[in-house]
Design a protein with these regions (language model features):
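C-terminal catalytic/motor cores of large multi-domain enzyme assemblies
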Residues: 1-292
Length: 292
């Protein structure tokens, strides 16, 4: 990401945008809540090449822990790096360009209903590749499952033990701090609601990909649910039906950060990367040629 000198009105986590067109600026006031400005995209991704790619990597190295989810994370991060408007957010009725690319998801400590959940936020550098991301996810998830709770989890546990009137006062204070961009970095750095993209890998529990709402709290502008990989009959290049490995993505976006044409081209880029996973062996900042 291009670094710029901090100016008056910038936040710790983003640079204020002062050249927003009148339509979008008006939307920030007419639709002040993120949940009022949600749009939804359901997209079917062909992951046949991803399945082959993982098999090839495991044949080369039996210790490889590469998973389809790791490739999805890398592909989404690469898309955000090359479609910068996706890394914008609206806070306090102003527009900002986020300083970093971060993807977040919830980690269940054990695979059962009673297990506690923890939050994981990955800050992804532009020179990162798929191998770096796979190692980081594998290591961070193991650390969460084996270790203690993070700062945000501990704060939430403390909050849950307070009397209701105190909880209401704290929540009101948090909303004020959030509006003016004054939330402590010790909290926001580990809070999934302050990430570029929030992911939910529903496929890991054998489910499809529903649409998930955004949150008015925080700065997250994109939510993606990932369904279960399955085989499906789809039209081939010559029009004849073929069986392919596919997965559904349920994408929810804040329409105030860009327009429909921009979102559509961004999804097309994401599909191209997913269908060509070898592109992720290069640093994420490396360009991609595709028909937009």
């Amino acid at each position: 990401m291009t670094k710029t000198k901090k100016r008056w009105g910038d936040r710790k986590d983003g640079r204020r945008l002062r050249d927003i067109d009148g339509l979008h600026q008006a939307m920030a006031h007419l639709l002040p809540n993120r949940c009022d400005a949600e749009i939804f995209i359901k997209e079917k991704m062909d992951v046949t090449n991803i399945i082959r790619y993982i098999e090839e990597k495991k044949a080369e190295d039996q210790a490889s822990k590469l998973k389809a989810f790791h490739i999805f994370v890398a592909a989404i991060a690469k898309t955000v790096y090359h479609r910068e408007l996706l890394n914008r957010f609206v806070a306090g009725r102003r527009f900002y360009q986020r300083n970093v690319v971060s993807l977040a998801f919830v980690v269940r400590r054990e695979f059962n209903e009673e297990s506690e959940e923890s939050l994981l936020v990955l800050k992804i550098n532009e020179d990162t590749d798929i191998n770096d991301i796979s190692r980081k996810i594998t290591g961070d998830v193991k650390e969460i499952k084996d270790g203690e709770k993070g700062n945000v989890d501990k704060v939430l546990d403390l909050f849950s033990g307070l009397p209701r009137p105190i909880q209401m006062l704290v929540a009101k204070l948090v909303r004020i701090l959030d509006f003016f961009g004054k939330m402590p970095e010790a909290i926001t750095s580990g809070d999934t609601n302050y990430s570029s993209v929030l992911l939910s890998n529903i496929g890991s529990i054998k489910c499809g990909a529903p649409y998930h709402h955004l949150n008015n709290y925080g700065t997250n502008s994109i939510m993606i649910t990932i369904g279960e990989i399955h085989k499906e009959q789809v039209p081939g290049k010559n029009g004849m039906p073929v069986i392919r490995d596919v997965v559904d993505f349920g994408i929810t976006l804040d329409e105030r950060i860009a327009d429909g044409f921009y979102f559509a081209r961004s999804v097309k880029l994401l599909k191209h990367i997913i269908e060509n996973p070898a592109l992720l062996e290069e640093p994420l900042i490396e360009g991609v040629e595709y028909e937009g």
